[in-house]
Amino acid sequence: MAKESVKARNLKRQALVERYAAKRAKLKEAGDYLALDKLPKNASPVRVRNRCKITGRARGYMRKFGISRIVFREWAAQGKIPGVIKASW
């Protein structure tokens, strides 16, 4: 489990990215890199890390489900993810 402060920091970054997305796009299109540099650092989408919604784990993140591989495996075994079954052949 990631620390709550790390999860909160990432959520704060996501909110900043959403708030400045239109402004960033407009400045990029105009080529105004000086004004772009004045925006907050955390408003850049590259600073947001994909994290598991349950544990906050950053590695082994499955984008399609929004959870880590460990949580995915547990939930799939318990049948909590619709349409996901263990493979057998």
UniProtKB/Swiss-Prot annotation:
<keyword id="KW-0699">rRNA-binding</keyword>
<dbReference type="InterPro" id="IPR001209">
    <property type="entry name" value="Ribosomal_uS14"/>
</dbReference>
<keyword id="KW-0687">Ribonucleoprotein</keyword>
<dbReference type="GO" id="GO:0006412">
    <property type="term" value="P:translation"/>
</dbReference>
<dbReference type="Pfam" id="PF00253">
    <property type="entry name" value="Ribosomal_S14"/>
</dbReference>
<keyword id="KW-0689">Ribosomal protein</keyword>
<dbReference type="GO" id="GO:0005737">
    <property type="term" value="C:cytoplasm"/>
</dbReference>
<dbReference type="GO" id="GO:0015935">
    <property type="term" value="C:small ribosomal subunit"/>
</dbReference>
<comment type="function">
    <text>Binds 16S rRNA, required for the assembly of 30S particles and may also be responsible for determining the conformation of the 16S rRNA at the A site.</text>
</comment>
<dbReference type="InterPro" id="IPR023036">
    <property type="entry name" value="Ribosomal_uS14_bac/plastid"/>
</dbReference>
<dbReference type="GO" id="GO:0003735">
    <property type="term" value="F:structural constituent of ribosome"/>
</dbReference>
<keyword id="KW-0694">RNA-binding</keyword>
<dbReference type="InterPro" id="IPR018271">
    <property type="entry name" value="Ribosomal_uS14_CS"/>
</dbReference>
<comment type="similarity">
    <text>Belongs to the universal ribosomal protein uS14 family.</text>
</comment>
<dbReference type="GO" id="GO:0019843">
    <property type="term" value="F:rRNA binding"/>
</dbReference>
<protein>
    <recommendedName>
        <fullName>Small ribosomal subunit protein uS14</fullName>
    </recommendedName>
</protein>
<comment type="subunit">
    <text>Part of the 30S ribosomal subunit. Contacts proteins S3 and S10.</text>
</comment>
<dbReference type="InterPro" id="IPR043140">
    <property type="entry name" value="Ribosomal_uS14_sf"/>
</dbReference>
